[in-house]
Amino acid sequence: MDAIREAIRIERLSKTFSNGRKALDEIDLRIEPGEMVALIGASGSGKSTLLRHIAGFTASDAQPSQIEILGRPIQQNGRIVREVRSIRRDIGFVFQQFNLVNRLSVETNVLIGALARLPWWRRLSGRFPRAERALSIAALNEVGIGEHARERAANLSGGQQQRAALARALVQRARIVLADEPIASLDPESSRRVMDMLRTLNIEHRLTVLVSLHQVEIAMQYCPRTIALRRGKVVYDGPSAALTPALLKTLYGDEARELIDEAAQGPDDTESKNTADNTPLQDAAPASGRYAFALNPAHSN
């Protein structure tokens, strides 16, 4: 069997909301296995919408388009495929809302990552095999919160909840992690720990990571490659190190202040806690430093 060349492949993806606003406009992307890529943009640029399409949570416009995950289509021409759940088994999700069930223990939340490979009766009864429980404790220890395994998820801080979500991705045996603003509202130390753990998943576990961020300096520190969105279009795809304030001004105009100011200030100083139980460019450059610098000329004036 041929090796999978792309972890994520997107062709001609567009999304128009019911109010007529174009949220995504002809997106074409290639992300190779093992890359750690930042997705940046001002508020309303389309970052979260793009991630939801990649995950198969939202269907695109009904026009020729495709999103593939590890060589398998997850949606085509505005329709999500029937096999979407099996494809999602390879994707770990980390969102701003933390996506944990507050009333359950931290360990049980992490074990949810194993449900897809368990018999139906174990799913219904919540009786997890000893091997899966051992795996969940090992994952919690790896992300640094093993001592909280028996606590209710509601008792964790925001940063700890994000790390629990990363532990769940390990138990799930995901191959791709989609992280939507995972350090929003976290204090600097919690933000560092979450980003360090994402990098560990990428380097040591060889997971492909696509993480949306507001803080350009965080993207430059952790992600070799950055994709920049503006008003639903890819305006930059290339080395993160090249994202100088001058280039951001060229790409975003006055909107660059949002990205530059947040980069200078860092995350908020107050770490939030979750109180809800419910869930919620142009052609990409190659990985591993072999970038084909891509600046959309339509946004370079």
From Swiss-Prot:
Record GO cellular component, one term: plasma membrane
Main location: membrane
UniProt keyword list: ATP-binding, Cell inner membrane, Cell membrane, Membrane, Nucleotide-binding, Phosphonate transport, Translocase, Transport
E.C. number: 7.3.2.2
One Pfam family recorded for the sequence: ABC_tran
Localization per record: Cell inner membrane
Biological role stated in the UniProt entry: Part of the ABC transporter complex PhnCDE involved in phosphonates import. Responsible for energy coupling to the transport system.
Protein name: Phosphonates import ATP-binding protein PhnC
Lineage: Bacteria, Pseudomonadati, Pseudomonadota, Betaproteobacteria, Burkholderiales
